[in-house]
């Protein structure tokens, strides 16, 4: 399907979801829908069951953190329609306290993806039967894919051979931060003269 066909498909889907789908776009040969996060179950059910669309295959779900936005996160779903031989991306903006309904009643395969979104971003999925952390430890502090999460984390976890158990300790940086000067006099004349480069002004 070319871009015009995808645009027509997007208009048809948006028209079938009045007040729920707020827009669509086509880029790089793929259709993207923007929807209301609170109505995501209705969106998924229509995309799966409507004979015009039949997006019956759930591919994945993820999120993106945009700290500068009022609605900080963008939750993203990808579906595939074997009937149309097309994919669709479904996006919804959510805030830190927005409750997003689980879609596992429509696509059971979304189970662990929803747990991952909670674990790594802190997005709360309601109606999920087992909303526990998935990739981090039970006592983990914070959500590591948020852009304000420190690169070093808050604690380090290691196995202590003396105590014969895993222990948690404050992060220790064994080497102080160093700033390196990567400028080189051999990279070309546009570079500034480095201190101690006595031959900088000599031309052969």
Curated annotation (Swiss-Prot):
EC number(s) reported in the record = 7.1.1.-
Q: Which GO cellular component does the record give, naming just one?
A: plasma membrane
Q: What's one Pfam family the UniProt record gives for this protein?
A: Complex1_30kDa
The answer, when asked if Phosphoprotein is one of the entry's keywords, is no
> Where does this protein chiefly localize?
membrane
InterPro entries on file = NADH_DH_suC, NADH_quin_OxRdtase_su_C/D-like, NADH_UbQ_OxRdtase_30kDa_su, NADH_UbQ_OxRdtase_CS
Which reaction is this enzyme known to catalyze?
A: a quinone + NADH + 5 H(+)(in) = a quinol + NAD(+) + 4 H(+)(out)
> Example GO molecular function term?
NADH:ubiquinone reductase (non-electrogenic) activity
- Give compartment(s): Cell inner membrane
List the membrane topology term(s).
Peripheral membrane protein
On subunit structure and binding partners, the annotation says: NDH-1 is composed of 14 different subunits. Subunits NuoB, C, D, E, F, and G constitute the peripheral sector of the complex.
Per the entry, what this protein does is: NDH-1 shuttles electrons from NADH, via FMN and iron-sulfur (Fe-S) centers, to quinones in the respiratory chain. The immediate electron acceptor for the enzyme in this species is believed to be ubiquinone. Couples the redox reaction to proton translocation (for every two electrons transferred, four hydrogen ions are translocated across the cytoplasmic membrane), and thus conserves the redox energy in a proton gradient.
Q: By what name is this protein known?
A: NADH-quinone oxidoreductase subunit C
Species for this entry: Rhodopseudomonas palustris (strain TIE-1)
